[in-house]
Amino acid sequence: MKISLPAFEKAKVLVVGDVMLDRYWAGPTARISPEAPVPVVKVEQLEDRPGGAANVAINIATLGGSASLAGIVGEDETADALTLGIQTLGVEPNWHKVAGKPTITKLRVMSRNQQLLRLDFEESYTQAESEALLAKTLPELDKVDVAVLSDYAKGAIISPQSFIQAANAKGVKVLVDPKGSDFSKYRGAYLLTPNMSEFEVVVGKVESEADLVAKAQGLLEAYDFTAMLVTRSEKGMTLITRDQPELHIPTVAREVFDVTGAGDTVISALATAIAAGSDLPQACAIANTAAGIVVAKLGTSTVTRLELIEALSLSHGETGFGAVSEDQLAYALEQAKLRGERVVMTNGCFDILHAGHVSYLQQARALGDRLIVAVNTDASVKRLKGEGRPVNTEDRRMTVLAALASVDWVVPFTEDTPQRIISRLLPDLLVKGGDYKVEDIAGGAEVMAAGGQVKVLGFEDGISTTAIIQNIMANQ
């Protein structure tokens, strides 16, 4: 499924949490110190970047959304540097200033694109300081569609229940990047985005995919969350909701240089997409792509809308939406129909994809907004075509089909005909290639009874999988 970026400029998001300054000192290393067995870095570059909740806010602004930021800072030079950093990027701060405590700073010493040392300057904030911050932000809820709680366990978000309840009362969705062993303090939030380590701190060791889903569902029920997105490093992400099948989204990252701030990027992209009108699966796919971009950068970084567009155009078919299960597709179709999109469906074995197939699928896609391709499983192809078929396994056939620009979803079916799955999905238009009569097309009667249409398209003459196989064998 192609991912449509929403109008990010419509997104209005409030970010509350642990703000910090990521400071970088970088330079070459050519010798070992005579004082101790450590490298000497000749510092040639100084750079400050907003970090923590501040990084979430500037990611939203960089994508094109409107972000307001609330956090706790000290009365120091670091707070001034942080303020300047976010204002330069279009984010206005709403600080609760605390005397006698430093603004949280993480100083990284770098050489040859490698981190040699990190120094942390911080003191935890008190319950009273946290409550003062959250109370200060409540009026901002009238101005936004989504609120983000960015919790780094530094004390800015200790007991956020009053904030979450106030947001819910105003219809503002609360997204949480959580920390700690107790998720009950986030009760009532719309969505949590723990990474796998954070998730296992709460639920214990995850033994399997099914175990992950079951434990996440337990948290949704126990704490009244609507959804949970578990980020899983090289395994991608898993979205669990209360009433839909889980959605596994494979990673799109090809190179990983630095995971600093990757979690900030995920929740900022999610918040911006949701505030701009994307549904959850689309928002998660956007966040997954954004994370794949940012981990290829060094240090705390942001992602632009242009980078997202370029990445999505390059990685179509790798976002986890191309090849889907029947249940996932049924949910996606509901969302497509709510958006008023015209859905076209076709089916076939597509054993060896050739020019005739590509032309046919392009014709089918041109008849609507979305195209479903239902593919016979290996067992089904063997029954229909005989021994030696299929040449390509179903996962390979589905992968190739999903990579086509004309194809939105690819779904397998086990029967000899797609009548059952067509009857369940009921597309707006069912198409079939060849010399079929409309009344003979499997699932056609059900589609027409539901108000849909059935159409026969022509294949290009002289091109077929069977002919290709015969030609290959004749030339061996």
UniProtKB/Swiss-Prot annotation:
> Keyword Transport on this protein?
no
Can you tell me where the transmembrane regions are?
none
Q: Annotated region Cytidylyltransferase: where? A: 345-476
Q: In which pathway does it act?
A: Nucleotide-sugar biosynthesis; ADP-L-glycero-beta-D-manno-heptose biosynthesis; ADP-L-glycero-beta-D-manno-heptose from D-glycero-beta-D-manno-heptose 7-phosphate: step 1/4; Nucleotide-sugar biosynthesis; ADP-L-glycero-beta-D-manno-heptose biosynthesis; ADP-L-glycero-beta-D-manno-heptose from D-glycero-beta-D-manno-heptose 7-phosphate: step 3/4
Q: Please give one Gene Ontology molecular function term for this protein.
A: heptose 7-phosphate kinase activity
* Substrates-to-products reaction catalysed: D-glycero-beta-D-manno-heptose 7-phosphate + ATP = D-glycero-beta-D-manno-heptose 1,7-bisphosphate + ADP + H(+); D-glycero-beta-D-manno-heptose 1-phosphate + ATP + H(+) = ADP-D-glycero-beta-D-manno-heptose + diphosphate
- Its Enzyme Commission number? 2.7.1.167, 2.7.7.70
The terms describing its cellular component in GO are: cytosol
Q: What does this protein do?
A: Catalyzes the ADP transfer from ATP to D-glycero-beta-D-manno-heptose 1-phosphate, yielding ADP-D-glycero-beta-D-manno-heptose.
Q: What name has this protein been given in UniProt?
A: Bifunctional protein HldE
Q: Which organism is it from?
A: Shewanella halifaxensis (strain HAW-EB4)
